[in-house]
Regions:
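Beta1/beta-strand and adjacent pyrophosphate-binding region of the FAD-binding site
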Residues: 10-26, 42, 228
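Glycine-rich loop(s) and the adjacent beta-strand/alpha-helix scaffold that form part
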Residues: 36, 47-52, 56-59, 197, ...
């Protein structure tokens, strides 16, 4: 069923068995699992069926740490949530990959590492999530998807570097709208901006969810079970806003809500100079391509799990992008970086260095421009390396409440994102291993672009907001337990990437959906009890 909060009476109360806050991939996945369950399910979405500018302004935020895309740039309030960023004209697929087994382990040298369960425990949910995400079979063995005659992976020697695989999903979560609207026991409530999880009747239980409508008036949802699925920034923000009873915020008795905030680090870290031009022609496994009917895949290079354990490295995948020789010119790279960052606020910390490269490299820029006009610059001369890397869990990297307020008079999210020297060092060490492997195979060598500066230059985020309501069985170490229930609150659960204790190098949505399906199984048991 479909409803709109703007059409409800002021102060109206809705009674439900399950109230879910946020209709992105996590909320949609759980709601679908509860169709026909017999429970009354309300799925609350701050936005409407489509993106609306007025609603999107509620995503205003502030950055006080390393430059990061602000919430109004990176988050979307509308049905299907931030997954709407993935589907743009000419780019109708999105990258997906499960976390690696090593990501779930307690890793020496990686502080705060370890999940409450291993990868094998999550595999059945991953297999189910593949279907929801429009992916191929749950098989990420590169050999399964490569054509030896046409797109073989690089022939690397046995050792620490391997080719890994990403699939590209085709499922648009917006496509689940009609299914949910038709469900007799599920009500999708649009334009319902949640502002508080109230615990005034019992400090250990959410007794109702307060919703604000466009005009500022209120309505309420009272539910047996509440699931917060509002995204990696809004999840901690809503807990911190719920402070009428819990003065530090709901679930924040140990000052953990908002801490360990991470992004998936992305950076152009170097390029491969091929030993022969044949390497470019033989790199067809690494760009996104169709490997089987309906299955899009992309290869990347990474350290094996064993090499990560031995070297105490963070996880990192290197995508290979075919580029012409202009990519090797510092002035060209700096100009491209500043053009790409023109909408970032604040500006990149390496701004002066980029400007210096441009000024001192005006001759190179001119030569490159003339070559482009004449089309005389040979295409595909190098393979650019783009790292997609894990961050070290860092309690000082966090989401808090700022002094600025949104139109409801509530503090906006303040992001203090803090990549560390360990993050940069791990990427560089991983890239050195790639260089060694390529040289040993006679394929080429790596030219490095990532320096030793701190804060690290070149880093940017991928809109992957992670870790700020982390999972741990010990309430002194995490916000939610192994069932994703908030410690100390009997009926409040959190879904989404904010519960990740560590982050891996994979795009998070497949794992978000797998965890949501796992949580749905738990909710069914609670409803039946």
């Amino acid at each position: 069923m479909l409803s709109d909060a703007r059409e409800l009476a002021s102060d109206q109360q809705i009674d439900a068995d399950v109230c879910m806050v946020g209709a992105g991939p996590a909320g949609i996945s759980i709601a679908r699992e509860l169709i026909g369950n017999g429970a009354s399910v309300w799925l609350l979405e701050s936005g409407g069926r489509d993106v609306e500018r007025r609603v999107q302004r509620l995503n205003v935020g502030k950055s006080v740490g390393y430059p990061i895309h602000l919430p109004h740039q990176s988050r979307i309030r509308a049905f299907a949530g931030t997954s709407r960023h993935w589907f743009r004209p000419g780019d109708e697929t999105w990258a997906a990959r499960p976390l690696d087994p090593v990501d779930f382990e307690v890793r020496p040298g990686i502080r705060y590492s370890g999940w409450p369960f291993d990868r094998a425990h999550l595999n059945p949910y991953y297999a189910h999530a593949q279907v929801l995400c429009g992916l191929g079979p749950f098989d990420y063995d590169p050999g399964r998807w490569s054509d030896p005659a046409r797109t073989p992976p690089f022939a690397l020697p046995p050792g620490p570097v391997e080719t890994t695989l990403f699939q590209h999903g085709t499922a648009d979560f917006d496509g689940y709208f009609e299914e949910l609207v038709r469900a007799p026991n599920v009500t999708l409530l649009l334009h319902a901006s949640v502002v508080e999880l109230a615990t005034r009747e019992d400090p250990g239980r959410v007794h109702r969810v307060e919703v604000r409508r466009d005009d500022g008036s209120r309505c309420f949802v009272r539910a047996r079970l509440v699931v917060l699925a509002a995204g990696g920034i809004e999840n901690p923000r809503l807990l911190l806003l719920s402070r009428r009873v819990h003065r530090r915020g709901l679930g924040n008795d140990r000052d953990l809500v908002g801490r360990f905030f991470a992004e998936r680090l992305s950076a152009r870290t170097g390029y491969i100079v091929p030993a022969t031009p044949d390497l470019i022609d033989g790199a067809g496994f690494y760009p996104t391509h169709v490997a089987a009917p309906g299955v899009h895949v992309q290869g990347a290079l990474r350290l094996t799990d064993a090499a990560q354990r031995e070297g105490e490295f963070l996880n990192c995948a290197f995508f290979l992008l075919i580029r012409d020789l202009s990519f090797t010119v510092e002035a060209v790279r700096s100009l491209a970086t500043l053009v790409k960052a023109r909408r970032r606020r604040p500006l990149p910390p390496e701004l002066l260095g980029h400007l210096r490269n441009i000024v001192t490299g005006l001759g190179d820029l001119g030569a490159t421009a003339r070559a482009r006009v004449r089309r005389s610059d040979p295409a595909g001369s190098v393979l650019a390396l783009r790292a997609q890397a894990e961050q070290m869990p860092n309690p000082d990297s966090r989401v808090t409440l700022g002094t600025r307020r949104d139109r409801f008079g509530l503090p906006v999210a303040k992001l203090d994102w803090r990549p560390t020297a360990a993050d940069r060092a791990s990427i560089r060490a991983s890239q050195e291993a790639v260089d060694t492997a390529l040289r040993a195979a006679g394929l080429g060598r790596v030219e490095f672009m990532l320096g030793d500066e701190q804060p690290p230059a070149l880093f940017e985020g991928n809109f992957h907001h992670l870790g700020a309501t982390r999972m741990h069985p010990d309430p002194a170490m995490g916000v939610v337990d192994a069932d994703c229930r908030v410690h100390g609150v009997s009926n409040l659960y959190i879904a989404g990437s904010s519960v990740f204790p560590t982050y891996g190098c994979s795009n998070p949505t497949l794992t978000v959906v797998a965890l949501a399906l796992r949580l749905a199984d738990h909710l069914k048991k609670q409803l039946a009890a």
